[in-house]
Amino acid sequence: MSKLTIPAGYKTPLSTYEMQRAIEFIKSNFQVNLGQALNLRRVSAPLFVEENSGLNDNLNGVERPVSFDIPDVGATGQVVHSLAKWKRLALKRYDFKPGKGLFTDMNAIRRDEEVDNLHSVYVDQWDWEKVIERQDRNEQFLRQTVRAIVGAVAETNDALQIAFPSLHTVLDREVYFVTTQELEDRWPDYTPKERENAICREHHTVFLMQIGDDLKRSGKPHDGRAPDYDDWSLNGDIIMYNPVLDSAFEISSMGIRVDEASMDYQLHKRGCDDRRELPFHKMLLSGQLPLTIG
């Protein structure tokens, strides 16, 4: 059942027609701002991948991808959940060099998504990935990238309000960095979502770090993360305070991606050792894929 909520007395400041114009404006402006901030080039994205390639995003490990047979090639296609792993392989195939990356306007179907104000069965999102050096696999580089993304979002918002004066969204460019363990230590009796809401009410733009591994108090992860793309020690969510919903509003789930060692640990930790035999995972564990952030 949908958990959609509409605050009492809420009215959108734009007509349906204006809303479509604003969406077009955001998309055209943000892709330029993001590309310049992170040195990215736009590429085309697949709608589906081959089932046994290991390229689809397993999300939390329980979501069922939309699948269909392709008789002419004797394979099964899966509509993507995200392009987290496909992008890394694309960077290798397209021969991107360190410091450069790609972005794409991704469409996906997540049939088992819990639908609410922020989540839909249909996904339309920017997906990006960038080649890095091994020495870039650190928290300082992660924070630097987060600040660049927040800057691109804020610049898009500034331009949007000039084009559509009835919009008055205020975004805080100052990012507050905090780990999931620090939130659990501060609010041990809160649910993960309640912790996110609480910290966003205090600091309106937050990067919540280290999502996926088990927390010390509860023994459970703050939120689910697949073991084969993000390095759980070097990832996080950019979340902003949404005054209309009075809640945290996730705008980006991102991170420095697994290398050979962190993927080995995370696959074993989550009981996913069977994935080691998939083509993507074999390439990564043998060092054939570039190190990336995305």
PLM regions and their residue ranges:
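Generic recognition of stable, solvent-exposed alpha-helical segments in well-folded globular domains
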Residues: 18-21, 25, 29, 137-144, ...
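A translation/RNA-centric and nucleic-acid-associated enzymatic feature enriched
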Residues: 179-294
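Flexible, active-site-adjacent loop/turn segments at secondary-structure boundaries
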Residues: 66, 101, 107, 116-121, ...
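Class II aminoacyl-tRNA synthetase-like tRNA-binding/catalytic domains
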Residues: 2-119, 127-131
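Extended, charged alpha-beta segments that form solvent-exposed binding/catalytic grooves
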Residues: 99, 104-197
